[in-house]
Each structure stands twice: as C-alpha cells, then as structure tokens.
A protein has these predicted regions:
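Catalytic-domain carbohydrate-binding cleft regions of carbohydrate-active enzymes
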Residues: 3, 8-246
C-alpha cells in the first residue's frame, strides 16, 4: 500500500527562487505567464537539468521535503521537458533554453537523462544502499544506468493505440533499456467511452478493450494502469459477474 502526490512549484515558491538564483530556471514561460493545467492554473517553468549545481539543488529540495520523510520512489511526468503542450518549434526552443551546455535545439532530447541523473546520484549520495526507482515519461540512450523506467506517454484509447505499443515496447527493449511500460487502457479517452451508458455498444467495446489491454500488460516489464476517466481499477471496468472478467 502506498500513496501518490503531485507537486508543482510556482514561480512564487522558495524552491523556484533558489534555482532562479543559480540562473537555472527557464524564463520564457514566466515572462509569458504560462499557466499549467492544474486548477486554477499556476505560472511556472522547468529547471535547467544540464547545470550540475542545479541538479544538486533539485535533489536537495526533494530530499529535504520528500525522501527524508520516507518517500523513495519517483514519478517524473512531463520530463521532455513539456513546458507547454502543442507549441510550434520556434516557441518550444524559447521555452526550453538556453541550457547550461548550450542551445536547447542541440541538447533538448537529453533532458530526461540529466533529470534522472540528478535524482539517482542525489539519492545514492544520501543512502547508497537504498534502491532507486524512477518512472519517467521521456527517455534517452543510457538512462538505464540511473535505475529508470519509462512509459510511452499519454497515448490514446483505441485498438490501434494498443497495437502500436507492441512495436514501441520492442523497439525500446532493443535499445538496451529493459524497463518499459504503458498506460493500460490508454490515457486520453474518446468521448464516446466517457459517455457510454450501460448496455451500449461503446461500453461493451470499452470493457473488451481494457480486458485485452490488461492481458497484454501482464507480459510487460512493468504492469500499470493509468488514464483519464472512466476509472481504471479492475473492479471498476465492469460490474461483478460481468463476462468481461470471464
């Protein structure tokens, strides 16, 4: 039995100010007052994970408020980094840099690797005998050395989306990274599934899709279900006694 928490620091917090004092916060999102999706929307940005001092400080903040209290597994979402969804290339360049190493266009794809390094090295420095576990939405070559697992992101909830995970997982494994997973059932749910009524063809299909996806997930390195409404617990997919479970 465990718990999950989502923590997002606004630019008004002490954590932000500490990293900003190092010159290690991307500034464009602050200048443009970009708000995240958590109600009512907070203005914030990402830290420069390419800066070794910023990585050290990032872990110190995590250690002080989380790891030292017994939290020892990490789910790092939006680690592309995804400062804002669906931006054009030029604006994305501005949102994600400049980095400590140079222009964002040259180093952008390695952000998840550097962020994982911050957490792995930081936790090991505090307790070298404690196993590190990090789940991240993005990956880069070599990240397995940081005890990192990756899932395939906010995928759709269609049959073709489930099919696409087969090749995605195989390609990931062939890249030398053993721990890969996906959102069983898909993450971004079609409206017809969300509005489906008991006895409808859409609800029957939703249950069948989840049934097959759970079966597929049982053979993946990590078994996890996650996504938007409807609820994803196995017992919430269908009522007791449903053919879905047979």
């Amino acid at each position: 039995v465990g718990s999950e928490m989502c923590i997002r620091d606004s630019y008004t917090t002490e954590h932000y100010k500490e990293l900003d004092a190092l010159g290690a916060m991307y500034q464009q999102a602050i200048k443009d007052s970009i708000r995240d999706w958590i109600y009512p929307g907070y203005i914030g940005s990402f830290y420069d994970a390419y800066n070794p001092e910023a990585r050290k400080l990032f872990w110190e903040q995590m250690n002080e408020h989380l790891y030292s209290l017994g939290i020892d597994a990490w789910w790092m979402d939006a680690s592309e980094p995804n400062v804002q969804d669906n931006t054009d290339i030029e604006y994305r360049k501005a949102l994600c840099g400049p980095t400590y190493l140079g222009p964002s266009t040259k180093y952008f794809n390695a952000y998840a690797l550097e962020n994982a390094e911050a957490i792995y090295d930081g936790q090991r420095s505090v307790n070298p005998d404690d196993r590190v576990f990090l789940l991240t939405r993005s990956g880069f070559a070599g990240q397995q050395r940081y005890s990192t697992a990756t899932w395939s992101g906010d995928i759709g909830t269609r049959w073709e989306d489930m099919k696409a995970q087969i090749s995605a997982g195989l390609n990931f494994a062939m890249s030398g990274i053993p721990y890969w997973t996906m959102d069983i059932g898909g993450f971004s749910v079609e409206n017809r599934y969300m509005a489906a009524k008991e006895g409808s063809e859409d609800l029957r299909e939703w249950r069948e899709l989840n049934n097959r996806w759970y079966q597929f997930g049982a053979f993946c390195p990590l078994f996890r279900s996650h996504g938007q409404y409807p609820c994803r617990e196995i017992y919430n997919i269908a009522p007791e006694g449903s053919p879905t479970y047979q």
